[in-house]
Design a protein with these regions (language model features):
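Phosphate-coordination/substrate-recognition cap region in phosphate-metabolizing enzymes
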Residues: 1-65
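Short beta-strand scaffold positions
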Residues: 4-5, 94, 118-119
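Short glycine/proline- and acidic residue-enriched helix-loop micro-motifs
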Residues: 57-91
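Glycine-rich phosphate-binding loop signature in dinucleotide/nucleotide-binding domains
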Residues: 103-113
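Generic beta-sheet signal
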Residues: 111-121
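Active-site metal-binding loops of divalent metal-dependent hydrolases
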Residues: 121-122, 164
Length: 180
């Protein structure tokens, strides 16, 4: 099964993945809005630096937003959002947990197996935090990184976080003049 958030960039990424793996049309693919990126309210679409390097550190009187917990970040975004669209930590973490658990439970009910899921950096970081808070200390996920989770007996287990090895192999192939 393949699942992505319903945002354009995850749909595009999933299309590339399925095409490269030869799975386009071969496995079911659907969207799930619960695994969307965090809603940054009035900062959605803005330059990340404005929010993370400017506004939030000033609101919390810290030098670096990395000093803030995910909960503090979420609540800070709610505080500075002028649209009322930003989600509280409770709403955000519940949405993300429900979305990924639904995918896992559906797969489990079908007899198990693997799913390809394309989501977003802050969303994946939040899910990892909900599984193991210590795992996100100092964590910054690169775009296109691969995180592998297992789901067994009603719980997620982290197998790999932010793996970039396949991109390094691809970069070497491109350097060698190969198109594929």
């Amino acid at each position: 099964e393949a699942v992505s958030s319903d945002s354009g960039r995850t749909i595009q990424t999933m299309g590339i993945i399925l095409q490269e793996l030869g799975l386009t049309g071969e496995i079911p693919y659907r969207y799930d809005k619960r695994i969307r990126e965090w809603c940054f309210g009035s900062f959605d679409g803005a330059y990340d630096g404005d929010l993370f390097m400017g506004v939030l550190p000033r609101v919390f009187k810290v030098d670096d937003f990395h000093q803030l917990s995910l909960m503090e970040l979420a609540e800070g975004i709610v505080e500075v959002d002028t649209t009322g669209w930003a989600e509280s930590w409770r709403a955000l973490s519940s949405r993300i947990k429900e979305g990924f658990e639904a995918i896992a439970k559906e797969l489990e009910a079908a007899g198990g197996g693997n799913a390809i899921v394309v989501s977003h950096g802050m969303t994946i970081t939040t899910l990892i935090y909900l599984i193991d808070p210590k795992a996100v200390e100092e964590l910054v996920l690169d775009n296109g990184s691969v995180t592998v989770l297992a789901y067994e007996d009603g719980a997620f287990h982290i197998e790999k976080i932010g793996d970039m090895s396949y991109r390094k192999v691809g970069a070497k192939l491109l350097e060698g003049g190969h198109d594929e």
